A protein has these predicted regions:
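Catalytic cores of carbohydrate-active enzymes across secretory and cytosolic contexts
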Residues: 1-545
Length: 545
């Protein structure tokens, strides 16, 4: 394998990478963000090396049965016959060895080259000689017990660091995209003590100076804790290599007598970043003793924005015709995925993201009768689209999906459709072919959110509860905002009195007021691009200042 010609790259660890709809290495926004970051780095020829895990995609594909139940089916992605390449050195397959309490584990490596400066490596323990539990860890992202999660984290952090060493790469910085790669510090300390003849405290400090950390959520479910004894069991082989007590490796994760991976990541990094300004404010309050910088997430516009919308000289008629084409393409996609169609001349409102209680997918379903009255107005008809996957660790999200589907297939059967298997391909159609992008989270729980950024880049108007990135936009004359305490009532009122009338108000066939809002949305999008995010990473996170 020929390495990219990079000097002092950033090594970007992420538990998820969304690079292709068929590649089962992501389940939500964390993976989408990682994919956008690494694609932007490649486009900008910024030296970056991604490190992730090659999951097999068990229970990866969402299927809705005829009676409205959610089923999960296994991915048919075959990494050995795919666009991924097996990583070799001098023609020989590269195998990394991981110490464990029961013996060494073998790790094979695949890669995907994105540019002359950027490559993503995927680690896998799905090897015949490994114990069954290590092989099953590759089944899915968040599906295992605590021991399985810790093994995945050791694979990502320690295995990834060993890989970088094996390839002879000298990183400028190790960037932890969420805390699950934090055990990288174990291997860094071992390297510094053995190769640099440092004492433990000196090696620990040097490792810390080379690590930065991005937190993506303050919600408890995204910040797992483990028993100290469980983590000690897995840490012992690494402590033994350098002749120290396990407690020395784990002390920075102590959190009320448990081990907090988030607290650990905070303590082993020299800088910490939040993913929006408001998230930064809350992070500083919750964890005040750290070097927080707020860098709002961004999206890789060349992946999400239709190229025609980058034309500054586009006329109103041309813009609207492109939008109508995108609406038609979305409608065809919906028919292909569900068997149900709709009139794509209708005002199309979309809610699409991972289904979780705090994202409030049922918010607009509070008063079904009133909603039906509004969307069935013959002069201002409205089509509602929903999409989203449940989370393996959240059984309540499966029940949410099935409840929404039941309502859509009964009371709202002529006006709402749930589209299964929300992935990159579907997201591209939804964020370009909808008219309104609906966002209804409980206040102060959405760290950033990026789906609305994709939408505005294509002139899809936002209707949102202010949270995460949406606090950073003046929505007057651009989109609409909802009070988190009265989401349903606000939505009904805005839809009936502002959104639908604006959309259907035509001059020579064109909704000029709507198009004006579309243009303003597109103008805003550049400020929420991955290009801007990468520049801020370089300036505020990767620099030694």
């Amino acid at each position: 394998m020929r390495l990219p010609e990079v000097k002092d790259p950033v090594v970007y660890f992420s538990n998820e990478f969304a690079l292709d709809s068929e590649l089962p290495t992501y389940v939500g926004g964390l993976g989408i963000l990682a994919g956008d970051f690494i694609n932007e780095a490649a486009f900008e020829h910024f030296p970056a090396i991604g490190v992730g895990i090659l999951y097999k995609g068990k229970n990866y594909i969402q299927h809705i049965t005829g009676d409205g139940k959610e089923e999960k089916r296994d991915s048919e992605f075959d990494h050995d016959t795919s666009f991924l390449r097996l990583t070799t050195i001098n023609g020989k397959e590269l195998i990394i060895k991981l110490p464990t309490p029961t013996g060494e584990i073998s790790v094979k490596v695949y890669h995907l080259r994105l540019s002359d400066t950027t490559i993503v490596f995927f680690l896998s323990t799905d090897i015949d000689t490994n114990p069954d539990e290590w092989r099953h860890d590759m089944d899915t992202i968040y599906g295992g017990d605590n021991d399985s999660q810790i093994r995945q984290q050791i694979l990502l952090g320690v295995g990834g660091t060993k890989l970088i060493k094996e390839l002879g790469i000298n990183p400028k910085v190790y960037h932890l995209n969420e805390g699950r790669a934090a055990f990288c510090i174990w291997e860094l300390v071992i390297l510094y003590m053995k190769d640099g003849a440092m004492k433990f405290d000196e090696a620990w400090q040097k490792a810390k100076e080379n690590i930065v950390y991005t937190n993506h959520t303050l919600v408890d479910a995204g910040n797992p804790n483990y028993t100290i004894d469980t983590v000690k069991y897995w840490a012992k082989p690494y402590a033994d290599q350098i002749g120290i007590d396990c407690g020395m490796l784990l002390r920075d994760g102590d959190f009320f007598n448990d081990f907090s991976i988030t607290k650990y990541a905070l303590n082993i990094s020299r800088k910490q970043s939040a993913v929006s300004r408001v998230h930064g404010d809350y992070a500083r309050k919750k964890y005040p003793d750290y070097n927080w910088v707020a860098i709002t997430n961004g999206v890789f516009l060349r992946r999400w924005q239709d190229s025609d919308f980058r034309n500054d000289t586009i006329t109103d008629e041309e813009l609207w015709n492109i939008h109508r084409l995108k609406k038609h393409e979305l409608m065809e996609t919906v028919i292909k995925r569900t068997g149900f169609g709709y009139d794509d001349n209708k005002l199309v409102i979309t809610w699409a993201r991972r289904l979780a209680d705090y994202k409030q997918p049922k918010a607009i379903l509070k008063d079904i009768d009133r909603l039906i009255e509004i969307v069935s107005n013959s002069s201002h008809p409205v089509q509602i689209l929903y999409a989203g996957n449940s989370h393996a660790a959240d059984m309540g999200s499966k029940a949410l999906i099935e409840e929404v589907i039941h309502i859509f297939s009964t009371k709202l059967s002529s006006h709402a459709i749930f589209i299964p298997n929300y992935n990159i391909a579907l997201a591209n159609h939804l964020t370009s072919g909808s008219d309104v992008w609906l966002n209804t989270p409980k206040g102060n729980l959405e760290a950033c959110g990026t789906s609305g950024m994709k939408a505005i880049s294509n002139g899809v108007l936002n209707c949102t509860v202010l949270d995460g990135w949406t606090y950073e936009v003046d929505w007057e004359g651009v989109g609409w905002t909802l009070n988190p305490e009265s989401v349903a009532d606000d939505f009904y009122s805005l839809l009936e009195n502002e959104m639908a009338p604006c959309y259907y108000d035509r001059t020579n066939g064109l909704p000029l007021k709507w198009i004006k809002r579309m243009r303003k949305s597109i103008e805003i999008a550049e400020g929420f691009s991955a290009k801007r995010m990468l520049e801020e990473y370089k300036k505020y996170l990767y620099s030694q200042n």
